[in-house]
């Protein structure tokens, strides 16, 4: 982080209390917001990196995981009003007119000043899921009385009919 960046929030859709997990193809997507302690607007740009399950760079080229250009401007901003500390509040939604995601998985979002592309001021992680195998969960009363006070009994069914599952122990 740059020490002038504050109040970073990353969340699904419009709910700031939600986890940063979006559904592939959902126009609500991910929202990223932050405050920049400054008197005037600074021009920020962003780029995305597709990561593997351990958040390491995947090595995929941009066209394999997104449609559009893997660079855009953070254009949504508002100046602070009636505060003792001056700041500019920035907001970005993904997907947007510049970037459409093609793959589910882990993404790293990097934000940097337009004039200094090598000087990243913040980066944040978000995930995109794909609903290929619906999961049905039901809670039922516990059958073992010894565990009743501290445990729950769940029945979980995964519908893999439409999904390609070769190794259920690792793929689910």
Residue spans of the language-model regions?
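Ligand-binding face of N-terminal immunoglobulin V-set domains in extracellular IgSF glycoproteins
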Residues: 84-115
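Extended low-complexity, serine/threonine- and proline-enriched intrinsically disordered segments
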Residues: 40-68, 166-172
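Residues that flank catalytic or metal-binding motifs in active/ligand-binding sites
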Residues: 44, 88, 103, 122, ...
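Short structured motifs
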Residues: 15-19, 31, 73-78, 91-95, ...
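Low-complexity, Pro/Ser/Thr- and charge-rich linker/hinge segments at domain boundaries
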Residues: 128-151
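Extended, solvent-exposed segments with strong compositional bias
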Residues: 66-87
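Beta-sandwich strand segments
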Residues: 116-123
């Amino acid at each position: 982080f740059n020490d002038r960046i504050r109040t970073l929030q990353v969340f699904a859709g419009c709910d700031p209390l939600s986890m940063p997990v979006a559904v592939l193809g959902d126009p609500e997507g991910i929202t990223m917001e932050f405050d920049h302690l400054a008197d005037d607007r600074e021009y920020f740009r962003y780029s995305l990196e597709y990561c593997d399950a351990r958040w390491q760079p995947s090595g995929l080229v941009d066209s394999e995981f997104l449609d559009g250009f893997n660079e855009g401007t953070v254009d949504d901003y508002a100046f602070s009003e009636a505060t003792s500390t001056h700041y500019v509040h920035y907001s970005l939604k993904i997907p947007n007119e510049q970037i459409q995601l093609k793959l589910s998985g882990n993404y790293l979002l990097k934000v940097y000043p337009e004039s200094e592309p090598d000087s990243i001021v913040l980066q944040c992680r978000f995930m995109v899921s794909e609903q290929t195998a619906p999961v049905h969960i039901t809670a039922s009363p516990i059958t073992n009385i010894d565990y009743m006070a501290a445990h729950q009994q769940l029945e979980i069914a995964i519908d893999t009919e439409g999904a390609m599952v070769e190794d259920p122990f690792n793929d689910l």
